[in-house]
Amino acid sequence: GVQTCALPIYLIKEIPQEPTSFIKLNSCLSGHDAKVIRPKGIIRLDYEPELVFVIGKRALGAKKSEAMNYVAGVTILNDLTCRDLQLREVASGSRFWTGKNIPGFGPLGPEIITIDEIPNVYDLWMTCSVNGHERMRVNTGDQIWKISDILEHFSRFIPIEAGDMFSTGAPGGVAVGKENAEDLYLKPGDIVECAIEGISTLRTTIIE
């Protein structure tokens, strides 16, 4: 969902009053060093490095003050997004599922770091590089919604089970909305590296 004021205005009309969400289906997930196919006819494939937290025990009605007790660890997601499809869905008023759930569009990993190994999960530098050139550098401290906000909100009525994962949302710096966006969208042959300080680097290769 929305995690920064830096996303383009046609993706977010205003900052929501509470965390928003969508689902990444299991069928779209891929691993570290995965080769992800850019579907034919798609030209606006964007990158979104995101911090993921993994639930360690069942949470229902969790409070912000105790939220971190439910978190087992953290990892990285590159929330690959087909803007061709997403922008059409946004324009029609529907949620953007299709452009985020194409097979392979959920690179995840390469490992889960236990939460006790992270001194401050709200002060981690996140970067995204394409072919060795840095495209993005942001800090988790700039996120609107913290892990505690997200878990309290979604566990209010829905039981969150051990093993469930929440990706904490897109930072600013993605290709969409930039003047040279057409040059920045991912193309076959591109190697994308999403890194989060203290966690690891997740690498993905785009192919035809």
Question: How does the language model describe each region?
Answer:
Residues 6-134, 207:
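Active-site microenvironments in enzyme catalytic cores
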Residues 1-5:
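Single conserved hydrophobic/aromatic residue that forms the stacking wall/gate
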Residues 83-208:
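Catalytic-pocket segment enriched in acidic/His residues
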